[in-house]
């Protein structure tokens, strides 16, 4: 593969992101003496210790967002607005930090968001239980008063990723790329607009959803379980949040929803968002030149996609 960053390159990128977060925090009046990197994959997540503030600095972005800082700012703005609103309703979330203005901050080529620091409790995740807890999150999000774009996590991401892979047979074999393009050509008309979705699935409700598997993004803290990482928050069907979660978790969601008299999952919609999620994994190979660990990390998802029948 060509153009793969060295460990030194990756460490330098992380250091730049940390420096930007520290500088932005200090400019906003925060005390920062001992910044700690909590996470470093698609974003560098920094605790600005001793302040109870965590900064998320995206460093590896899909091609469409990398080329459009305004779109990135808008997505971050949406996340802060939705999560701030949820916190005000008493929904268990990791909220935006109350110590700084609730707005993305641009510095040194990065755009970052500021969140309250929480103490993590190490615990084996129970995804079926987490899926059941997503029902209450969906009930709350159904009332969100703001306007959000429809299925924004798909818009530009899959098509642009496949475009990048067109010239990278070292990342994706031409036969795989041809299959992926064919599948996306069939899915895109359904997922690209509310109108296309409604035509295929008449009567299926669209609402505000988390956008990135809340069962996998439920954080266990010393003060309880908190929903987190709403970076892909969007308008869409509830099924989007249960994509690729598996039958046990799907059933747990349905049981919890039925007990409350709330909508259960539509398996037809779930099949479509599962197919799109598999294609997202394929398109994510376009990010390997920026994040080499993805090459290994994506293998299980790619094997699953190759083993599945092509999307009709």
Where are these regions (language model features)?
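Juxta-kinase regulatory segment immediately upstream of eukaryotic protein kinase catalytic domains
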Residues: 1-32
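A cross-family kinase active-site recognition segment
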Residues: 2, 121-182, 206
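ATP/Mg2+ or Mg2+-diphosphate-binding catalytic cores
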Residues: 2-9, 152, 161-171, 283-312
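A conserved alpha-helical element in kinase catalytic cores
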Residues: 11-19, 57-108, 124-132, 136
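ATP-binding glycine-rich phosphate-binding loop
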Residues: 28-49
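A glycine-centered beta->alpha junction motif in the catalytic cores
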Residues: 59-63, 108-124, 163-174, 278-296
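Active-site Asp-x-Gly
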Residues: 208, 219-271
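Catalytic-loop signature of eukaryotic-like protein kinases
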Residues: 212, 216-218
């Amino acid at each position: 593969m060509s153009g793969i960053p060295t460990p030194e390159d990756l460490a330098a990128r992380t250091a730049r992101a940390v420096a930007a977060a520290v500088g932005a925090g200090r400019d906003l009046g925060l005390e920062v003496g001992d910044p700690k990197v909590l996470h470093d994959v698609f974003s560098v997540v920094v605790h600005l210790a001793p302040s109870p503030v965590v900064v998320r600095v995206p460093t590896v972005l899909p091609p469409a967002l990398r080329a459009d800082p305004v779109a990135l700012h808008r997505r971050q703005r949406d996340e802060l607005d939705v999560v701030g609103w949820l916190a005000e309703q008493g929904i268990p979330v990791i909220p935006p930090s109350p110590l700084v203005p609730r707005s993305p901050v641009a510095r040194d080529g990065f755009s970052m968001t500021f969140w309250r620091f929480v103490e993590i409790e190490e615990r084996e995740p129970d995804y079926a239980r987490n899926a059941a807890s997503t029902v209450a999150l969906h009930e709350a999000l159904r009332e969100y008063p703001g306007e959000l774009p429809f299925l924004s996590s798909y818009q530009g991401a899959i098509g642009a990723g496949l475009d990048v892979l067109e010239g990278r047979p070292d990342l994706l074999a031409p036969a795989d790329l041809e299959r992926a393009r064919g599948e996306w050509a069939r899915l895109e008309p359904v997922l690209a607009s509310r109108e296309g979705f409604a035509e295929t699935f008449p009567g299926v409700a669209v609402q505000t959803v988390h956008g990135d598997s809340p069962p996998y993004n439920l954080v266990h803290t010393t003060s309880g379980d908190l929903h987190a990482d709403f970076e892909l928050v969007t308008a869409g069907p509830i099924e989007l949040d249960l994509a690729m979660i598996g039958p046990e978790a799907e059933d747990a969601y349905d049981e919890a929803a039925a007990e409350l008299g709330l909508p259960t999952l539509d398996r037809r919609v779930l099949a479509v968002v599962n197919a799109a999620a598999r294609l997202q994994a394929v398109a994510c190979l376009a990010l390997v030149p920026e994040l080499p660990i993805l090459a290994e990390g994506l293998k299980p998802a790619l094997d699953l996609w190759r083993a599945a029948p092509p999307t009709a």
